[in-house]
Amino acid sequence: MNVLKLLCKYHVDINISSHSSGRTSLHYAVLFNHKRALSFLLARGADVFKKDACMCTPLYYAMLSDQRDMVTMLLHSKKYIVKFRNKLDLHNAIETGNIKVIKTLLDNGVNENSVDKDGLTPLHYAVKYGNISIVKMFVIR
């Protein structure tokens, strides 16, 4: 945290990315589960849309690692839809099968009827991956 504060004090660009990985300080805050750093960076306008060399956003990493608090923080920082490999966040979460992350996304306003580039909804993905629990969750909603 001290390093982040010092960098901001001297107006260093907090969105600068690593040459090799393309990751920003926001990516690393998520990857290392550092909520204070994430909050600090978001308050200073860190780019939540910035993708790394793998085309992953900080939100994608938060979903993959089941960091629901961070998912919520990122979603509340800006209302947005981010595509990763032509799929939307909710579609990606369904692929992982993590019901808690899926519920977190839905509870924070992610559109459950969104469609990917092929016109498939999250429910289509749940059926495609054979995840009965997720299918039931969508049918009950």
UniProtKB/Swiss-Prot annotation:
Domain of life according to the entry: Viruses
Keywords tagged on the record: ANK repeat, Repeat
ANK repeats: from-to residues: 21-50, 54-83, 85-114, 118-140
Gene3D superfamilies in the record: Ankyrin repeat-containing domain
Record flagged with keyword Repeat: yes
Pfam families in UniProt: Ank_2 (PF12796), Ank_4 (PF13637)
SMART domains hit by this protein: ANK (SM00248)
Keyword Signal: no
Name of this protein: Putative ankyrin repeat protein FPV223
